[in-house]
Each structure stands twice: as C-alpha cells, then as structure tokens.
Amino acid sequence: MDDDGIRVEDLLKLKLIVVGNQGTGKSCILNRFVNEAFEENYQATIGLDFQSKNITIHDQDVRLILYDTAGQEKFRSLIPMYIREAQIILLIYDISDKESFESMPKWIQEILDVKNSEAIFVLIGNKIDLESERKISYEEGKKFAEENNFIFQEVSAKTGKNFGTLFEVQIYEAVYNKFKSEFDKREKIGYEDDHANYDESNENTNKNNDNKVKLDANIINNNQSGKKKKRCC
C-alpha cells in the first residue's frame, strides 16, 4: 500500500521525463505539478532527479514516475537511458530566452536518436509571468508544435497558470487515448472483481438468511411445544 491506500502493484505505471536547456524551469514545473508549489530559489538539478505522483485518469489509478534532467552539457550523457523508458516527454523552453526555444530541434533529435516517436511529446513554453520580457510569441511555439505533431501549452510554474489545462486536460486525455487498451483491460478487471465481491456478498447473505429461517423455525417449534405443556397442566 502507498500513502493513498492504493496497492502499488495495481497501478498503471508511466514514466515522464522533462528535457530542455538549463534555467528553463524544468524542476519548477515538476514541483508545481507534484506539490502545487513554487520555490523562488530552486537549486539546479545535478545529473538526474526523480519523484512520483499518483493521478486518476478516467477513474483509473495511474502512477507517474517523473524524471527531472539537468540542462548542463556535462550531464547530457545520462539522459538517453531514461528517455528510452519514457512514455511522456516534456520539452521545456523559456519564453523570455530565445536560445532555449532554438535548442528544441537539437533536443528532439537527441531523443529520436535513442527512441522512436511513439511517446507523447509535449512542448511547453514556461515563464509566461515574464510577459514583458517575452522573446518567443505564442504563435511561434504553437506552429513549431503543430509541425511536429506535439501537444502545446504555455504556462507559468511560478503562478500555476494553465497547469490544470496542460496536465488534467491535454496530457491526461493524450495518455488515455494512447493507452486506451490498457485502461479498458484494467476497467474490465475491476468490473469482474466488483461482481465477484458482489456475488460473494450475496452468497453470504443468503446463507445467513437460511440460518435465520432455520433458527426462527426452531423458536416457533419450541414455543408451540411449550404451549402444549401448559395446556396439559
């Protein structure tokens, strides 16, 4: 059992990884999603960090394993092994940093070098709270995402703006559609388990009712016997 009272072995497990240049707010995005919080002085990730979060998609429990990667060049060699296992890839750029957006093709190529395009790709423009410093327009980001068939959204890890839309609508729906057969299978198993428990409960109830009928019959017989004895006196 985990802290939510859910058996871990019953959860559908999916791996999500965030990639992008250093300083784009990758760690802050995960912290906002997992803990609904923002830390102004967040320490840069060294190498790779991970955490997990249990979510519910179409009434099914899912455990997301979240990998946070370092943006520094010296740690890039660590990333491919985790990219291979990821079902969801978040590509993060900073709307106030043109270089971070222009680095996206390089990041995508690094991903495709070790993994096919079957993963769910999500392009995220972070730091929309810095609107006055914007270098990449919404239209530029959206166009790039559409050209690559990616999900797209702009967010602010600082304020939490658009996080509900990004995760609970766009990403969750993409996950459900991508792994629908797995969701359907688990839903069927849950349905059969519920019916098995229902049948067992009914069977126990019927047994208890049978015993009650027999017990009531004995009480009636004893009462009748007692009445006869009373009349004899």
Segments predicted by a language model, with ranges:
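Conserved catalytic network of the ASCE P-loop NTPase/AAA+ motor domain
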Residues: T56-H58, P80-E85, L112-S117
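Switch II (G3) loop of P-loop NTPases
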Residues: V62-S77
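Conserved Switch II/interswitch segment of TRAFAC-class P-loop GTPases
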Residues: A86-P105, K115-E118, D129-K135
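Switch I (effector-binding) loop of TRAFAC-class P-loop GTPase G-domains
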Residues: V34-D61
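Conserved alpha-helical scaffold flanking the Walker A/P-loop in AAA+ ATPase domains
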Residues: Q51, R76-M81
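Generic enzyme active-site microenvironment
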Residues: L66, I92, I124
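Conserved P-loop small GTPase signature centered on TRAFAC-class small GTPases
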Residues: M1-G23, S27, H58-D61, S117-L123, ...
